[in-house]
């Protein structure tokens, strides 16, 4: 256990610290090699882990490529400028619409896309409106927060969701039927908390005349228009084709290919830059990181956690839901959500829970790993990258400020979301 734990801690430190620009993929690979050399994992574990991660990572990359292409076409700026007009010059209404836009983008383009793509657009828009630094910080924090709390509804909304759905064989429709209503509760709770926390920083009014026309944001009309068609086809494909056995990654890849071909023909978008910007290292990161996590499983960590989950399961649906969700949220906040979701999945699989209790634990694990990272900056790689993007925009958020805000905001939203899950699953009893 000590050796497996030491390798895991070393890997996490390298992934978060990234000394001398060392990519997350190579850090995870180093951890995996150490685990193999020391016998913590065995060569036979490699195909097992690959079977867990391949569909998730491929789907995630395809969705991010679609997001990047649409961003280059002006799609997201166009949407942001439209919702800013729906605010009708009222600050609180603008704040609400920006949060709801972030929720929609997170649902369709994954949490990473929502946080990293929307943030620079929101900053530019707020600067154009002449908002203060405090107001800009409030809007930026809101955009970053909703990106994770609203990344629950669809399998493709978060890499965590895809990994868990693949592990437990959850279909797209089955997953959405449970998590869409839960996500609505999460969005409402997030909106309430954001308005309460940042109430002093949201301006009463703003001058809509300072905003440019949404049409001016469109840089590649062909890619912009095709994007709407691709989104519709993706949603239909996910709900219709995935139940027939076609992987989510294959459906997403076709959508990315169609959009890429259109963008390539238009010459307005640097498609080479888009491909270089795709998170290719996530492939070797997922395989390497999960091999290291599998070492923890081989060393008995997940067996210990299974015992904890058994106690929760014995106390009924609500205890299982709330207990699992808060446990995995805490683990995500201190050891990153990507390894945590697999630790949680392996522990649930090894527990004696069955029926609706096990189902509750599976979804609570997803919720904990989606929302838990908002407590600390190290909870997710997307948050670390988001903070880096902000620093490049001369907006530095200290880890202390992030933690204070994160823990106050996250715990109530997490509780409401888990309670919504327990209520939703109560109807299946």
Curated annotation (Swiss-Prot):
Family to which the UniProt record says this protein belongs: Belongs to the ArsB family.
Keyword annotations from UniProtKB, A to Z: Arsenical resistance, Cell inner membrane, Cell membrane, Membrane, Transmembrane, Transmembrane helix, Transport
Function: Involved in arsenical resistance. Thought to form the channel of an arsenite pump.
PANTHER family: TRANSPORTER ARSB-RELATED
Keyword Signal appears in the UniProt entry: no
Protein name: Arsenical pump membrane protein
Source species taxonomy: Bacteria, Pseudomonadati, Pseudomonadota, Gammaproteobacteria, Enterobacterales
Main location: membrane
Molecular function as annotated in GO: antimonite secondary active transmembrane transporter activity; arsenite secondary active transmembrane transporter activity
Residue ranges, Periplasmic side: 42-45, 119-120, 173-177, 295-310, 428-429
CDD domains: ArsB_permease
Transmembrane segments: 21-41, 46-66, 98-118, 121-141, 152-172, 178-198, 228-248, 249-269, 274-294, 311-331, 407-427
Cytoplasmic face residues: 1-20, 67-97, 142-151, 199-227, 270-273, 332-406
Localization: Cell inner membrane
Annotated organism of origin: Escherichia coli (strain K12)
Protein's GO biological process: antimonite transmembrane transport; arsenite transport; response to arsenic-containing substance
Pfam families assigned: ArsB
One GO CC annotation: plasma membrane
Membrane topology summary: Multi-pass membrane protein
């Amino acid at each position: 256990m000590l050796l497996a734990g030491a390798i895991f801690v070393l890997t996490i430190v390298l992934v978060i610290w990234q000394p001398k620009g060392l990519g997350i993929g190579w850090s995870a690979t180093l951890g995996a090699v150490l685990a193999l050399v020391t016998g913590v994992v065995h060569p036979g574990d490699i195909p097992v882990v690959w079977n867990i991660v391949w569909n998730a990572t491929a789907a995630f990359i395809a969705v991010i490529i679609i997001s990047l292409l649409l961003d280059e076409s002006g799609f997201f700026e166009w949407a942001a400028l439209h919702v800013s007009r729906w605010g009708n010059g009222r600050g609180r209404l603008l704040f609400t619409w920006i949060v709801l836009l972030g929720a929609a983008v997170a649902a369709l383009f994954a949490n990473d896309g929502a946080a990293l793509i929307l943030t620079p657009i929101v900053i530019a828009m707020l600067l154009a409106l002449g908002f203060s630094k405090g107001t800009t910080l409030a809007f930026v924090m809101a955009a970053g927060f909703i990106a994770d709390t609203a990344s629950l509804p669809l399998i493709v909304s978060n890499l965590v969701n895809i990994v868990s759905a693949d592990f437990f064989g959850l279909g797209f429709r089955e997953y959405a039927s449970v998590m869409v209503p839960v996500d609505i509760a999460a969005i409402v709770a997030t909106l309430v908390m954001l308005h309460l926390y940042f109430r002093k920083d949201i301006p009463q009014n703003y001058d809509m005349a300072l905003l440019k026309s949404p049409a001016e944001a469109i840089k590649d009309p062909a890619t912009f228009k095709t994007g709407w068609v691709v989104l519709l086809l993706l949603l239909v494909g996910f709900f219709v084709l995935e139940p027939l056995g076609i992987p989510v990654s294959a459906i997403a890849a076709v959508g990315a290919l169609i959009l890429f071909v259109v963008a390539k023909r238009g010459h307005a978008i640097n498609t080479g830059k888009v491909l270089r910007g795709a998170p290719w290292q996530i492939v070797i990161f997922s395989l390497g990181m999960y091999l290291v996590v599998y070492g923890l499983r081989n060393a008995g960590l997940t067996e210990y956690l299974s015992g904890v989950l058994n106690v929760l399961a014995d106390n009924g649906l609500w205890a299982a839901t709330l207990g699992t969700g808060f446990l995995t949220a805490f683990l995500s906040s201190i050891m990153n959500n990507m390894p945590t979701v697999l630790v949680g999945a392996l522990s649930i699989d090894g527990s004696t829970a069955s029926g609706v209790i096990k189902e509750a634990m599976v979804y609570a694990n997803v919720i904990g790993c989606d929302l838990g990272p908002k407590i600390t900056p190290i909870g997710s790689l997307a948050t670390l990258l988001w903070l880096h993007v902000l620093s490049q925009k001369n907006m530095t958020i200290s880890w202390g400020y992030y933690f204070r805000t994160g823990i106050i905001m996250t715990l109530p939203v997490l509780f409401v979301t888990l309670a919504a899950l327990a209520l939703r699953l109560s109807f299946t009893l």
